[in-house]
Structure formats: C-alpha cells, structure tokens
Amino acid sequence: MSAMTPREIVHELDQHIIGQAKAKKAVAIALRNRWRRMQLSDDLRNEVTPKNILMIGPTGVGKTEIARRLAKLANAPFIKVEATKFTEIGYVGKEVETIIRDLVDVAIKMTREQQTKKFKHRAEEAAEERILDALLPPAKDQYGESQRDDSSSTRQTFRKKLREGQLDDKEIEIDLAQAQPNVEIMAPPGMEDMTNQLQSMFQNMGGDKRTKRKLKIKEAFKLLSEEEAAKLVNPEELKEQAIFAVEQNGIVFIDEIDKICKRGDSSGPDVSREGVQRDLLPLIEGCTVSTKHGMVKTDHMLFIASGAFQMAKPSDMIPELQGRLPIRVELEALTADDFKRILTEPHASLTEQQRELLKTEQVTIEFSDDAIERIAKAAWQVNEKTENIGARRLHTVMEKLMEEISYDASEQAGTSLVVDAAYVEKHLGALVEDEDLSRYIL
C-alpha cells in the first residue's frame, strides 16, 4: 500500500496529466484515506468505509489516464473494467462478480512477485548449487547418495567464474519441472465454482513431471532461480495475503458507467443497463463474493466510476447507485492552451516521443514554439467543428503532420529538421479549414 501524501500523489499525476486539479485532488485524498484507515485500531477500522468517487467529464480529458497512473502509484490490487462488458445475471455475458475474481487474480500475481523478490537471494543460491552440480557432478557414497563437497577448490573456482559471468555461454543439461498445461473450460454464468474445480483437477492430473533441457548457463540460472523461488513460496500464505490486500486496499475503476444509464426518454427492459446497475449495488455496498481462492468481502474496497455523460445524466443512474458514489468530480473540457501544454509538459510528451523515435534513424527534429501553438490550435479547432474527442485529437493531428517526415526518415540519416508554423500550415492548414476533410481525415 502506497504511503504517499495527497500532495505527492497530485505531483506525480501532474507529470502525466495536464489540468484536472479537482479530480487529481479527489483521487489523492481517497488513496491517502486508504493508508490512514490501515493505521486505525481493528474495531474502528471496520467502521470506516471508503467514499466512492464518480468522475464526470467529456471524452479525452484524462479520466482513464488518471486511473492508469493511479494503478501504478497505489501499490495495491487495482483493476479497470468497462461497465459495457457486463450483463444482468441470468443473461449471456460477463457477470459483475467476475470483477472481484479478476481483482483477486491480480492480487495473487502481485503478492507472488513480492514473495519471489523476498526469497530472491535464497533462490539464487540454490540455483547456483544446482548449476555447479551439473558442471561438477558430486561423487556418490556406498548407498548411492550424492556427496557434495562445497569446500573443494575446483568447486570454488567454478563458483567464482559463474558469479563473474565467465560461464554464461557454456551449455549444460538441467532437470526442470514441466510446465502444467493451462486448461480453459467454458461454463454458463453462475457455474464458476465447478469450472475452477475441473480446471484444478485437470492440472493436478499431470503430477510433478520433470524434463531434461540443454540450455546456456545464463538462461538456466534464470529458470532455476524461478523454480527455487516458487518452492519457497507458501501457497496458503500467498492466498491469505492476497485476499487481505484485496479486501483492505483493493481499488476498482469502472469506466463508461454512463453507457449503462437508462435515458429518460427510453422505455422497456434493457439487459445491459439497469440490470447491471442493480448487480453493481451489492458489490459497491459490500457483499461476499466466492472466488477460486476463497471468499472475498467487498465492504472496504474503493470504487471509482467514470463516464462522459453526453447522452445521459448522472441523475439517470438508479438512485441507490447514485447514493453509493457520494464524491462527484467534474473534469473540464480541454482548451487550446491545455493542448499546448499537453504537447510539451508531461513526461514522455507527444513531441518528445516523436523526437526519440526519429533519433533511432539518426534524424534530429525540433518543434518551434509557434509550431506547437499552431498544432494545439488545429486540434482544438477540429474538436470544435466536429466531435470533441479531447486530447486524443492531438494523436491524430500529430500523426498526420509527421507522416511525410516518418516515411522519409530512414533515407535522411544525419540530418536535422525544424518543424515551424509554416510547415504545420502547409500540411494541416487545408485539412483544418475544410470541415468535410477534417471530419474524415482528422
């Protein structure tokens, strides 16, 4: 769990997302409150439930990007799902409970990586011994048992060479556990438990099969280290820690929630809309979900929902769901000035990406300030005239602008180019002004 302060979280998000201070502040406080809750006494901790967030804003203003960056910062089990992927229980399609099952799988993977890292040193030592045994097979005693002599000068010489990388390209034959086949079983909704039991039955049928493989020492060391680390990880402890992490620190980001809202002017039942909202209610309110790793409570998970709400309004959600998303954050539409900042300020901005990509062809490219201004203005104008797709329009405009340079770059190694306002005007001017062209090309 991340112990970053709200100010630090916002600063980190500022490296990648321009503007949207309110949304950043809301998610930063929510993330910090997860840490604060973990510092409380057990009886009080159970009483403190997270305040779920609803982010409202047009497409392309940073809602999904905030979620992606938050996942990296949180250091907690995190899953992002699209609300439109789910259908009401009893119909063909994914049920909302699969969100929690997938989140537990994420937590298992995260916890396994942490445990493997913890045992890395011991695993590498064991792998080293197995490689030395392959290089210098130990003598056997009268009962046929291997008698390893760790103090022998030959073994120590080989150990030194192995650690210095002098033997990396030498081939050896090693005994490795055979990978279990991954059996996927399709089953109707509601029968996940039976599916999981069948899957584990098929996987256990293979038993502990081993196979001999001839590999270079460098590759063998990596595979043996992984195998030894897996032996040191306790599966029961792993499940326990993963489920605790999900229950106490899990974060679920539900995107496109506006697409499952029933608009006021429509009538009749809708399998993928109101029913899905009703299925989400117990999950957000707090319930127990059965997974293949055990029972998981959702009472203290943080849910962040987001939507553009262009065709529907937040008030079109069923009242119970509105009440379970108490924190509302509105994200502002992006201006031409925001576009200008997006092109230059974030870490790995679009202009920096283009510079680095062309550098691989020994072509140096620079963007003048007036060119940046013109690109930003062009993207903003197209958004105003056609559909407003926010910052995503910049990708389209940049690709169109760089098309010619990218095509010829491999034949222009060693050259330097400056993209100025005149170049932008020449390649984008007509497209921006002609509404029909910009509708189809930009």
Swiss-Prot record:
GO biological process: protein unfolding; proteolysis involved in protein catabolic process
Basic and acidic residues biased stretches: 142-152
UniProt region (Disordered), positions on chain: 134-162
One family name in Pfam for this protein: ClpB_D2-small
Compartment annotation: Cytoplasm
Entry keyword annotation includes Signal: no
One annotated GO molecular function: ATP hydrolysis activity
Residues that hold ATP according to the record: I18, G60, V61, G62, K63, T64, E65, D255, E320, R392
Keywords: ATP-binding, Chaperone, Cytoplasm, Nucleotide-binding
GO-annotated cellular components: HslUV protease complex
Function: ATPase subunit of a proteasome-like degradation complex; this subunit has chaperone activity. The binding of ATP and its subsequent hydrolysis by HslU are essential for unfolding of protein substrates subsequently hydrolyzed by HslV. HslU recognizes the N-terminal part of its protein substrates and unfolds these before they are guided to HslV for hydrolysis.
Subunit structure and binding partners: A double ring-shaped homohexamer of HslV is capped on each side by a ring-shaped HslU homohexamer. The assembly of the HslU/HslV complex is dependent on binding of ATP.
Family, as annotated: Belongs to the ClpX chaperone family. HslU subfamily.
Official protein name in the record: ATP-dependent protease ATPase subunit HslU
Organism whose genome encodes this protein: Pseudoalteromonas translucida (strain TAC 125)
Lineage: Bacteria, Pseudomonadati, Pseudomonadota, Gammaproteobacteria, Alteromonadales
Gene expressing this chain: hslU
